[in-house]
């Protein structure tokens, strides 16, 4: 470009007006540069085309995904020929489907979808994840509003109160050391029948302790009265 401008300046005669025209060669270079710039912008704007699957194609893809998450090249080729898709599109679909499956599995393991596990079939979520096993037993009964854990907690609280009362009546001196030294609390994993039996046993212990305390008190009063009578008889009153 500098050479062309220099040639134009040298060809100009002294005293003549300044040249305003550009040489044809310089015009061609400018047009070529502009064309390359437009071509680069066109390449940048190009995006990958998205494939719109039909319902039949999706059903076939999901059916094969239920059988295996990693189909081999022969299975992909056969499926692509049957569905009229390219093998690359089938492979990309399986990659996206596996990523979606892993995301659902992570949500299930985190407990996000435990309550809504029925929305996903076990084979669709993953063949190696049993969704039914993740559901709690009490979720099968929609009319039950109380969970087994709440039953165990309630029984444990009742048993704990009974144990505290029994321990206080049996030996007040050991109350400062805590009732669990004498009656350790049962774990939450015990069945409800065991907790109920332990609660009834503790209640019977409380009743026996109260009865023993009353009997001891009555016998002490009777002994005091008998001693008073003997003392009065000895003094001749």
Swiss-Prot record:
Q: Which GO terms describe its cellular component?
A: nucleus
Alphabetically sorted, this entry's keywords are: Developmental protein, DNA-binding, Homeobox, Nucleus
Localized where?
Answer: Nucleus
From the record, which residues define motif OAR? 219-232
Instruction: Give the DNA-binding residues.
Output: 46-105
Q: Name one GO biological process term.
A: cardiac atrium morphogenesis
The GO terms describing molecular function are: DNA-binding transcription factor activity, RNA polymerase II-specific; sequence-specific DNA binding; sequence-specific double-stranded DNA binding
Query: What Pfam families does this protein's entry cite?
Result: Homeodomain, OAR
- Please state the protein's primary subcellular location: nucleus
For region Disordered, the annotated ranges are 1-50
The Basic and acidic residues compositionally biased stretches are: 24-42
* Tissue-level expression: Expression restricted to a few regions in the brain: thalamic, tectal and brainstem structures that include relay nuclei of the visual and auditory systems as well as other ascending systems conveying somatosensory information. Not expressed in kidney, heart, lung, tongue and adrenal gland.
Keyword Cell cycle in annotation: no
* Its job: May be a growth regulator and have a role in specifying neural systems involved in processing somatosensory information, as well as in face and body structure formation.
Q: Which family is annotated? A: Belongs to the paired homeobox family. Bicoid subfamily.
The protein depicted here goes by the name Short stature homeobox protein 2
Native species of this protein? Rattus norvegicus
